[in-house]
Amino acid sequence: MIDQELVQSLKAWPFKEALQIIKKNGGLLNFKIPSKGYVLLETGYGPSGLPHIGTFGEVVRTSMVKNAFSFIIDCPTKLITFSDDMDGLRKVPENVPNKEMLEKFIGKPLTSIPDPFGKFESFGHHNNAKLRSFLDEFNFDYEFVSSTEKYQSGDFNETILNIFENYPKILDIILPTLRAERKETYSPFLPISENSGEVLQVKIEEYKMDSKTIIYKDPSLDKLVETEVINGKCKLQWKVDWAMRWMSFDVDYEMCGKDLTAVSYTHLRAHETAVNL
């Protein structure tokens, strides 16, 4: 039996966040466990650099919300830490060895870049391992999820194809928020060049709905190339990628900074709406 008076007296921010999750799922009196069987909370990590106190802090705060939720409601919970390790390397971090070697891999997925420390399969794998070790040392209850593994295994395929089929609606949402020069080349899809291995931000010349493929000009070949959008051949632009994860995992809660609140959070919900039409 929920003591509503006690719950309403809980003013600390983790409880306020937990109550938002409860409200989303029917409220205190009519709470319904999600169809997946648990409430899912997510944290994110960009392994283009070593994990730091900010990464740790996000997991700490999300765990506080998770614990507050469990204090109020008797419902299974799960926390996943999602690594964006399929992102392209944008710049070489200052606090790593072999910087000149890494310079050659700018633009390539983090899990396709050699580990400058020489210990793991890739730079992305190295940083993922550091994060997991960091979290395990403090006994966090979490499940680690790799973007590369999810894209390449096909786990995201169904949602990606849904996005592909509804890409005009998504463009209608995103394009008004972009600068003029960015509007000309923006696409929800970032193809990964089979020639250079880079994650490309290029104009998509054609979306072929029958074959679920896109055609783009590969700058490393200077010619048009056709590729499928699933099975890790493309990744999604970050805002669409974020919404795709929420849909694929059925995420109930994720903390976000200023760039993912207000307008960006509205985009997230709009993406979810668009791809469900």
Model-derived regions, located:
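Conserved adenylation A10 loop of the ANL superfamily
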Residues: 52, 197-199, 266
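Charged, often glycine-rich, active-site loop that binds/positions anionic groups
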Residues: 86-102, 159-160, 164
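Active-site neighborhoods of enzyme catalytic cores
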Residues: 108-232
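Conserved small/polar residues in nucleotide/adenosyl-binding loops
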Residues: 266-273
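N-terminal catalytic cores of NTP/NDP-binding nucleotidyl/phosphoryl-transfer enzymes
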Residues: 2-94, 243-263
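Domain-scale activation on soluble regions of proteins
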Residues: 91-93, 122, 277
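Short, compositionally biased low-complexity segments
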Residues: 96-108, 132-139, 231-245
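Non-catalytic, beta-rich accessory domains that mediate macromolecular interactions or localization
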Residues: 51-53, 67-72, 76-78, 96-120, ...
